[in-house]
Amino acid sequence: MKVNEVKEIALKYLENINNNEFEANLFIRDFFGLSLTDIHFNKDIECSQEEIDKFIGLLDIRASGCPYNYIFKYKEFYNRRFYVDERVLIPRPETELLVEECINYYKGKTIDRYLDLCTGSGCIGISLASELDIKSVTLADISKDSLEVAKKNAYIYNIDADFIESDLFSNIVGEFDLITINPPYVPLNRKRILDKTVIDYEPNLALFADNDGLSIIKKFIQEYDKYLTDDGLVLMEFDESQGDAISKLLEEKKVNFKIYKDYSNMDRFVVMGGR
């Protein structure tokens, strides 16, 4: 069977998916183990009817709304492939900017103790631990299920880390030179306009927060300096609508901070120090 014949099948099932031709190519690549070059040149695919039936079954799952990354159990993030499933959020490209800024600042330096809160898949913490000289890495999350995914990814990339089930700092001990956090920050009223695939498939616990999405962020800002060394840094992601509110909270706390924008020129994360 030729690639184009298989692609016709895929496009039929993916007709209501945005960028369906691109996804059809990804399905063929990931299911049959072909390169995009093989797909472009319409290579022959050696496959049984059983394999075609399984392929169609996965297409049907995608057509029902399940995110592609949960079907094939991975997401590319900062030049690495992370395992993901329904226990964790799918990493977003904007979060790579936080990782990149942190790497730019700490490249060539040694970090004694590093904490990644709300770690989810571990994509932030494991990326930084892979790129930087960090002596001690702690990945923490309120969800035991999320920590299992983070453990799997840490094993894949040979990262030695401590894993702690913790509601923010509830089970955290000691001070850290670097803290990163990508907390639940989506305002609850955004539920009615978010993509249905996000609402139905991604863990809502890791997405939404009360008080215009600021409830967990406010708690973190109140507590973080007790766990940060004098010259330590915090990098925190937030919703594009929250820049002014976060600036006000940090000005009241009298800490140094700088807000950074994402690819769409929207406020997206903050770098801040202690008191």
State the predicted function of each range.
Residues 14, 106, 154, 224, ...:
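Conserved hydrophobic residues forming the short capping helix/wall of the S-adenosyl-L-methionine
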Residues 27, 65, 95, 124, ...:
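Residue-level signal for inorganic ion chemistry
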Residues 30-104:
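Conserved AdoMet
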Residues 1-32, 39-40:
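Non-catalytic accessory regions of SAM-dependent methyltransferases
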Residues 97-193, 197:
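Conserved SAM/SAH cofactor-binding pocket of Class I
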Residues 83, 211-273:
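Conserved Class I SAM-dependent methyltransferase catalytic core
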Residues 69, 186-189, 241:
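Active-site beta-alpha loop architecture of Rossmann-like, nucleotide-cofactor-dependent enzymes
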Residues 185-216:
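Mobile active-site "lid"/loop adjacent to the S-adenosyl-L-methionine
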